[in-house]
């Protein structure tokens, strides 16, 4: 659901989401991950700046990239898809290579509801795509092959049944295994 300018305590929500993300050692967090069906996610790529394979310029950029995205819409994804191991606070203990295009153009509003259209590339684009997927109802595992999903089935079932230990609070929703008419 789009967020209106008068959304109650939006600044506090954004700050709380950053704190939750930091406490959980994440680089991004979307509102659906904290139980809110709104188009909001936050990103802070500083943890990636420790990667020795990056140039000094890339490290500096990652270290300083922190943004909230409100009512975001990816307008374009470009380039040859490249694999990178992704994990997710919603699916703890699982990391898999996900193919994503390296460059995106995204339109979003900042915390002051100023609209921006920007182009991002590399790891920043990947994190944005990952978090954007959450507000679209998509998880990184949805990008995996059927074979890979089958290999992960038991782990995913354990997570969805609450059989997982993490250093942060998780909510588990009961699922009906049978259809009702």
Model-derived regions, located:
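Positively charged
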Residues: 1-181
């Amino acid at each position: 659901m789009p967020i209106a300018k008068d959304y109650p305590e939006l600044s506090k929500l954004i700050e709380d989401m950053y704190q939750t993300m930091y406490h959980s050692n994440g680089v991004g967090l979307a509102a659906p991950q904290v139980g809110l069906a709104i188009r909001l996610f936050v990103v802070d790529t500083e943890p990636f700046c420790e990667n020795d394979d990056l140039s000094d310029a890339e490290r500096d950029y990652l270290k300083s990239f922190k943004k909230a995205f409100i009512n975001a819409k990816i307008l374009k994804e470009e380039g040859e898809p490249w694999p990178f191991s992704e994990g997710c606070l919603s699916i703890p203990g699982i990391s898999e290579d996900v193919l994503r295009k390296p460059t995106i153009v995204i339109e979003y509003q900042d915390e002051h509801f100023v609209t921006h259209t920007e182009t991002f590339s590399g790891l920043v684009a990947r994190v944005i795509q990952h978090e954007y997927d959450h507000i679209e109802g998509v998880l990184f595992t949805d990008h995996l092959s059927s074979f890979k999903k089958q290999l992960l089935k038991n782990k995913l079932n354990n997570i969805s049944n609450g059989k997982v230990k993490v250093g942060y609070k998780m909510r588990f929703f009961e699922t009906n295994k049978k259809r009702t008419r």
